[in-house]
Amino acid sequence: MEEQKKLVSQYAIDHYIKSNMHLGIGTGTTVFYAIKYLSDKIKSGDLKNLKLYPTSSDTKYLLAKENITYESKFTKFSKNIDITIDGADEILLEKKALIKGGGAAHLMEKIIAYNSHQLLIIADETKIVQTLGEKVSVPIEIVPDALPFITANLEKMNFNPVLRTCKFKAGPIITDNNNYILDVKMNIENPKGAEKYFKLLPGILEIGIFNHQNTKVIYYQNGQIKEI
């Protein structure tokens, strides 16, 4: 799968990323390869004058490791980002709907993506599903003090929310925005409706269901790179 991630990352950058772009940079293992290749293109002079908008502290670290400058403050943001390049945990191709947030960064990922003209998703073949939610849980970022209320409300809906923890630390995982993550297993028949519905609950800041109006998916399947 690592080779697939590398190939789709290189394809996406070669075909869609141009000099002088405002570019959102997502989070995750596939984006790692995109950053490495982006670094090569910048060093060779093939890509120049990029303004990069990272979506997480992990991404900032990887960019800094490659000596790539990025926008640390968005106070001068005056135009939509041209493209955000990112990965996904699940992809429903027919609706170009996604589940994201395995890296606990989907709040900022969605802010950057939904302020971009295009969301460019890169993925290996394991991320393609027939029903959204069939492999992974849906992450929901919440205000910490709202945990008991949101948990109770979700349980009334017959869901089983699980507070995300980490074996390397005590207590729940804390996001870059100092919030908690609830992982909720569900099969999603109406991705757009589900995205809107759950955000009506007070205390829910963002849900990891993505329905960007201009999504391009570049994925590896049956021995070749495909796009839709």
Swiss-Prot record:
Xref: NCBIfam families: PRK00702.1 (NF001924), rpiA (TIGR00021)
Pathway: Carbohydrate degradation; pentose phosphate pathway; D-ribose 5-phosphate from D-ribulose 5-phosphate (non-oxidative stage): step 1/1
Pfam families the UniProt entry points to: Rib_5-P_isom_A (PF06026)
GO cellular component, as recorded: cytosol
EC nos: 5.3.1.6
Quaternary state and interactors: Homodimer.
Keywords recorded for this protein, A-Z: Isomerase
Protein known as: Ribose-5-phosphate isomerase A
Lineage summary: Bacteria, Pseudomonadati, Spirochaetota, Spirochaetia, Spirochaetales
Name of the gene this protein is made from: rpiA
Function of the molecule: Catalyzes the reversible conversion of ribose-5-phosphate to ribulose 5-phosphate.
An annotated GO BP: pentose-phosphate shunt, non-oxidative branch
Catalytic activity entry: aldehydo-D-ribose 5-phosphate = D-ribulose 5-phosphate
Domain of life: Bacteria
Residues at the active site: E109
Organism expressing this protein natively: Borrelia hermsii (strain HS1 / DAH)
Family in the record: Belongs to the ribose 5-phosphate isomerase family.
GO molecular function, one term: ribose-5-phosphate isomerase activity
Annotated substrate binding sites: T27, G28, T29, T30, D86, G87, A88, D89, K100, G101, G102, G103, K127
